[in-house]
Amino acid sequence: MPGFDRISELPESLITQILLCLPTKDSVKTSVLSTRWKNLWLNVPGLDLTCSDFPFEDEEYEQVFINFIDRFLEFNPESRLQTFEVDYKRREIRGFKDRIGTAINRGIRLLDAVSSTMYWEEECIMYPYLEFMPLNLFTSKTLVTLKLRDSALNDPGLLSMPCLKFMILREVRWSGTMSLEKLVSGCPVLEDLTLVRTLICHIDDDELPVTRVRSRSLKTFYVPLAYGVGCRSRVPDKVLEIDAPGLENMTLKEDHFDGIVVKNLTSLFMIELNIKFAVDYRRSFDPEDLSKRNEIGDFLTGISRARHMIISQKTVKALESYSKVGSIPKFNNLSHLKAVFPSPLLPFLPAFLESFPNLKNLILKIAFAKDDETEELNLINVPRCIVSTLECVEIKGLFEWEEEEMKIARYFLENAAVLKKLTMSFIDYPRYASNSDVYEDLDKLTKRSQQCRIIVDDE
């Protein structure tokens, strides 16, 4: 029947679970639908609120914000909450820590709090401020997911979070004897950790010289891209130490630490690197720095059990510099590799592949630049993996079909004994050759593996 309201016939418990998927500002809007819907949003087992949901110019802004939260928490004080997500980064809101503590006592499974280290006065003057999390956070028996940004953590003494599996810490400040190592030690089932270290020093904290991640349960460790080209540290050099025998996936997409130490990564499956082993974007690896050489060598040895690897152009440059003064260890378990090679470093490719004797799948993206002064490309040495194990090669990032591109394709076709597929992927159509022309040129080349299939396509 047209206009028939079927949603209102659903049980209240199901409706509130549906509303839980919406930001609170949207679930509140349903209160005008009918008398039955008037207070349904107050029974939703979670809060998702941001300071931008309230008029910032209101003189009673902070009080309106906190009163709204109080009304929500007090409407059904005996009910259990599932989620508490609040972004309050504009101003200092007195008493907000107590509201987080109340939500924790209500049995929330997810806490997502975004604070700020700078607050605005009414005269538009900024001043530094740290919002400390309530101490009952560290003894929550129900939290499964914890997300904190720009928050501060004190040492609670007792720390036990028996259900916490997922933790995201972005620019968290550590106070006194509190540290990441201590926090992780109280999370016996932690599986997934994301860490963004603060590189800004307008507020002093008590970050230790070495940030340790020690966990037997941790399976995924992720340092995301957060600062981009402006990544540089204004605080003293710090070291990251990872000791996690159960770790399966590790991604380091940015240099947040000047030194990285890895221990006992016996279960490592996938590693993704976009680092150059120095925080400041203006600095690069110095081959004359003996301590840095040893650090990189130990790091590579520590991750050498990985089976899949993704490395960026930045990391390839660092490894090429390192290879002139040190030896890249063998990654005997590695079967899949995706690497971005700057075109001037293509001569380094055979020596680089020597470190992966059992490689089966290679995705090679070539980073061309108009101002690259590339020497004549001569790929002579043939590593073991090309002769014995390499089955699939995809070459990406191609713009043209000229002599250099032909040499790269010929290198794999003429030397790869068990190659099953070679894919040439062009960013744009070649200027002087169509895909069919490229295919014909490749098909004429000598193939060591007669079963190799050639594919030419566009990215």
Curated annotation (Swiss-Prot):
Residues 374-426 form the FBD domain. CDD domains: F-box_AtFBL13-like. InterPro entries: F-box-like_dom_sf, F-box_AtFBL13-like, F-box_dom, FBD, FBL13/AtMIF1-like, LRR_FXL15/At3g58940/PEG3-like. SUPFAM superfamilies: F-box domain, RNI-like. Residues 4-50 form the F-box domain. SMART domains: FBD, FBOX. PROSITE patterns: FBOX (PS50181). This is FBD-associated F-box protein At5g27750. It comes from Arabidopsis thaliana (Mouse-ear cress). The lineage of its organism: Eukaryota, Viridiplantae, Streptophyta, Embryophyta, Tracheophyta.
